Amino acid sequence: LDKIHRQAQKSAIITESIRVRQGKQLTSDGWTGEETRGELQDMILNCYTDKSNTYHNIVQYFKEEIKHAKSILDVQIIVPCKQGVSSVASLNHIAQQIYNPKSKKQYKIMKSGVVQWVLKVGDKVINKQNKYQIINSDGSVVDIFNGNLGIIKDIKDDYILIDFQGIGYVEVPKSHAPYIELGYAITCHSAQGSQFDTVIGG
């Protein structure tokens, strides 16, 4: 793409992404620290020598950003790996504890007798597999797709009620629940084609 549609021309997100595409370094060799860039001051670059700082820094940024966000859907953590210290799995776990610690209505996702993750009312979630022809109790028929983000509104005996962005309320059957994952943190791949008010990258 060579025409900017989704972001202001003066945004550092644009200028820095162009540099990346051109194979240019964003910093000088060995530079560490925090710097806000762009005419709009809309990108914070934070570089450090110890990669173990990634997890801590992402958590701190997340805590700060959710204070100002209108919706948890506006704040997105994006990282490259599904497993590991600073991964989708570990960051979703801590983000849930920070954002939605008190919700008691929950549903555990099990695999081989082991809890993989817990879905709670109020959680931000992402659907990971297309599911067609879901019939809601009001008779409406809805499709959901891989990558759809939403908020859990209720958990019933046989379905999870999720308000999906751009779709609305969907009564997702419990049989599909293993494909509903926490969505506070997602991979770069899952984020393709999406847009968010605030992105925390690791």
Predicted regions and their residues:
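Hydrophobic residues at beta-strand termini and immediately following loops
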Residues: L1-D2, V172
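Conserved helicase motor core of P-loop NTPases
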Residues: D2-V142
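Conserved nucleotide-binding/hydrolysis modules and their immediate coupling elements
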Residues: H93-G202
